[in-house]
């Protein structure tokens, strides 16, 4: 499992540069680069900042990492992946739209 590959995958899905992710997660660009390339470990604090930047949980980042191969590609057919892994792959604006749609559907069922 490589957290760095998952971080790179999520960053690119958001269309962010390493500098933008560094700014969002209160760290330096070099730390992001080192993490993505496997040259540096990660602390619980940086994982929390990254999760907040990606609008997900730390456990979702780990889930994504578990479902990636050595090249950063998803291993499983998307139909068999946990919904959390699928959801965090979406850009944040799409995540917000889906959340709104889900809440609207829930409200109409009341």
Curated annotation (Swiss-Prot):
Q: SMART domains, from UniProt?
A: HTH_XRE
PROSITE patterns per record: HTH_CROC1
Family matches, as InterPro entries: Cro/C1-type_HTH, Lambda_DNA-bd_dom_sf
Pfam families (UniProt xref): HTH_3
Q: Which organism is it from?
A: Acinetobacter baylyi (strain ATCC 33305 / BD413 / ADP1)
Where along the sequence lies the DNA-binding region? 18-37
Question: Keywords in UniProt for this one?
Answer: DNA-binding, Repressor, Transcription, Transcription regulation
Name this protein carries in UniProt: Competence pilus inhibition repressor
Function, as annotated, reads: Represses transcription of the PilB-specific inhibitory protein CpiA.
Where is each HTH cro/C1-type domain found?
7-61
In a knockout, what does one observe? Deletion of the gene results in a 100-fold reduction in transformation.
Which Gene Ontology MF annotations are present? Answer: DNA binding
**Which CDD domains does the record associate with it?**
HTH_XRE
